[in-house]
């Protein structure tokens, strides 16, 4: 049952979805797992946000928690822009805003994968044409990645497996990474199918959605003809 309701949830559990989506819980998971994230903080008031920006330093990326499609996301480069954002922002204790260090001149990477709780299948590692900070829905990406070293691709695949198994994901999931110099950062994890899954299927021939659907009904990766 899920959240006290008489409903059976197939695939990734509600708790695992919350751990991937909740800022503080995921940061704790990342620390335990040895994953690097941009410096960040959460705020529910103007004072919270000003304190976070003072600690992190400009530029910062501010966005609401638990939203899709990049709604409300802004890159702020100075105090004037922060003041303007705070005038328009909706602030409430139950509607936190996330403040992150903005990684300038970083390459964004999208990964689509599937996990059955025992194994992880990395469907594709996609390189974005635009720098990190442009929402992935507005960005062009490539399969295969064009400018990423084999060593970095191996690190990305390894961290994808750590995340999929560590969060107990069952089915599809998507990870957004950023590469800045030789550093690899985890930007966010989406414990679900993403907008790029159809692109992965067309470009690679790998039916990731079908594979993930079979996982959710009890067919592990080892029993699928992949």
What is the meaning of each model-derived region?
Residues 48-49:
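Short acidic active-site motifs
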Residues 1, 7-11, 29, 33-34, ...:
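ATP-dependent carboxylate activation and anion-phosphoryl transfer catalytic cores
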Residues 40-45, 75-78:
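Short acidic-hydrophobic, aromatic-tinged amphipathic segments that line or gate anion-handling sites
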Residues 1-21, 36-42:
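A short, GP-enriched loop/loop-strand-helix hinge that lies immediately N-terminal to
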């Amino acid at each position: 049952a899920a959240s006290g309701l008489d409903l059976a949830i197939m695939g990734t559990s509600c708790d695992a979805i919350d751990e991937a989506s909740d800022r503080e819980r995921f940061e704790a998971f990342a620390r335990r797992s040895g994953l690097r994230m941009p410096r960040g903080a959460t705020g529910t008031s103007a004072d919270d946000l000003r304190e976070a920006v003072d600690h992190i330093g400009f530029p910062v990326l501010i966005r609401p928690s638990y939203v899709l499609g990049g709604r409300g996301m802004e890159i702020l480069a100075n105090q004037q822009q922060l003041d303007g954002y705070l005038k328009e922002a909706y602030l409430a204790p139950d509607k936190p805003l996330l403040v992150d260090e903005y990684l300038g001149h970083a390459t964004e990477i999208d990964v689509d994968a599937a996990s059955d709780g025992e194994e992880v299948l990395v469907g594709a590692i996609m390189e974005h044409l635009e720098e990190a900070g442009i929402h992935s829905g507005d960005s062009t990406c490539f399969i295969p990645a064009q400018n990423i070293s084999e060593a970095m691709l191996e690190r990305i695949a390894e961290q994808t497996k750590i995340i999929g198994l560590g969060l107990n994901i069952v089915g599809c999931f998507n990870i957004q990474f950023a590469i800045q110099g030789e550093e690899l950062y985890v930007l966010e994890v989406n414990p679900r199918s993403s907008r790029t899954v159809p692109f992965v299927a067309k470009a690679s021939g790998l039916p990731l959605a079908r594979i993930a659907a079979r996982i959710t009904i009890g067919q592990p990766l080892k029993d699928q003809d992949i």
